[in-house]
Amino acid sequence: MVNNDAKIGRREFYDRVESVRPKSPPRERPTYTYSNSRTVDGYSNRGPRADF
């Protein structure tokens, strides 16, 4: 038995793994935000929108 994964590049291997792995929800939309305004750390601010 020949391990074909050793012949391909590491990036191609991870692309193959990502295609098999179930898609995780995007982390740009945390569930604890109260509004669409986000600060740098990801938490929402209840005040006016802060664009950094």
Curated annotation (Swiss-Prot):
Ranges annotated as biased composition (Basic and acidic residues): 7-30
Region (Disordered): 1-52
Name of the protein described by the UniProt record: Putative uncharacterized protein DDB_G0288577
